[in-house]
A protein has these predicted regions:
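Charged/polar, solvent-exposed surface patches and flexible loops
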Residues: 16, 20, 24-27, 31-34, ...
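Short, glycine/alanine-rich amphipathic alpha-helical segment
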Residues: 69-93
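Residue-identity detector for glycine
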Residues: 4, 30, 60-63, 67, ...
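Coiled-coil termination/hinge junctions
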Residues: 45-55, 89-138, 143
Length: 143
């Protein structure tokens, strides 16, 4: 998480900052959703192949092992290392990422509405803005 204070010369400048981040996040989300769709198809195919192999191994008598279970290793409190993820495991992580990006977009849109109110009154004052993950959380107006 990035946290900081940034100075903006006006509400208009802050709006441009928010709009730039919204544009970037929407592009990232669009790219990610395309990857997720591809992974969904791979995951479904992987699931059908595993079901077929399971059925065949029961009929043939000799067991087969897929050998592709992902190993998840915790590297500290907030970092995981996933070794050899199946498409469904990778899909789960990427869907979580897409949800996080979507929530950030919603927060930025809400912040933008608030800043628009400042811009509408023609406020021409310096703004010190507390940003948490590039989302404005507090604005100090300085005359």
């Amino acid at each position: 998480m990035s946290v900081g204070i940034r100075e903006f010369s006006s509400a208009q400048e802050l709006l441009r900052f928010i709009d730039a981040h919204l544009t970037e996040l929407r592009k990232t989300l669009g790219d990610l959703l395309r990857v997720i769709e591809e992974l969904r198809a791979k995951s479904e195919l992987d699931k059908r192949i595993r079901e077929l192999l399971l059925r065949l191994s029961r009929q043939g008598g000799e067991g087969t092992s897929s050998g592709s279970r992902p190993e998840i290793v915790k590297l500290g409190e907030s970092l995981e290392l996933v070794i050899n993820p199946s498409p469904s495991v990778e899909l789960r992580y990427l869907e979580d990422l897409a949800e996080t990006i979507n929530k950030k977009i919603a927060k930025l849109q809400a912040a933008r509405k608030g800043v628009e109110q400042l811009a509408e009154i023609g406020l021409e004052a310096k703004l010190d803005v507390i940003l948490v993950d590039d989302v404005p959380t507090t604005i100090f107006i300085k005359f």
